[in-house]
Regions:
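Post-signal-peptide N-terminal segment of Sec-exported extracytoplasmic proteins
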Residues: 37-72
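Bacterial Sec-dependent N-terminal signal peptides
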Residues: 17-36
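Mature extracytoplasmic domains of secretory-pathway proteins
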Residues: 59-94
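Sec-dependent bacterial lipoprotein signal peptides
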Residues: 1-17
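Short flanking/linker segments adjacent to small metal-binding domains or redox-active Cys/His motifs
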Residues: 99-129
Length: 129
């Protein structure tokens, strides 16, 4: 009788541990919606700043392709808080890299180069052809 009780108890404990592990995995999953919200926050932050003839523009690698490297480059005026922007972009890039692993994402693996020609058009930093 004790043996059956002990085995039953072990089975219950085992399943409880397995359930809590899968619950924690589910809560750590990154969604495409979360990435879109974070990207919009970054783009919105950048859009609050203007460039001019005296305020130049720069670019930062953004996103994470499944096979490595950035998906694109964001352009921004030099008046942004660069440390803040880098921090937000690095967080986003890390989340997207984690999302790629989590979803077994694939990409074209094409190397995206930083823009060579960035200019200020109507007070907005723009990649020029």
């Amino acid at each position: 009788m004790k043996s059956i009780f002990f085995k039953s108890l072990l089975v219950i404990v085992f399943f409880n541990i397995q359930c809590s592990k899968s619950d924690s995995k589910t809560s750590n999953l990154i969604t495409i919606q979360q990435l879109e919200v974070k990207k919009q926050e970054i783009v919105s932050y950048i859009s609050r700043f203007n460039c001019s003839a005296t305020v130049g523009c720069n670019s930062i690698a953004f996103g994470s392709k499944a096979c490595g490297g950035p998906k694109e480059y964001l352009v921004f005026p030099n008046t942004v808080d660069l440390d803040f922007l880098r921090n937000k972009v690095n967080q986003y890039n890390a989340l997207e890299a984690q999302y790629n692993i989590q979803t077994n994402a694939v990409s074209d693996c094409m190397l995206v180069m930083p823009p060579e020609n960035i200019g200020c058009v109507n007070n907005v930093c723009t990649i020029l052809d």
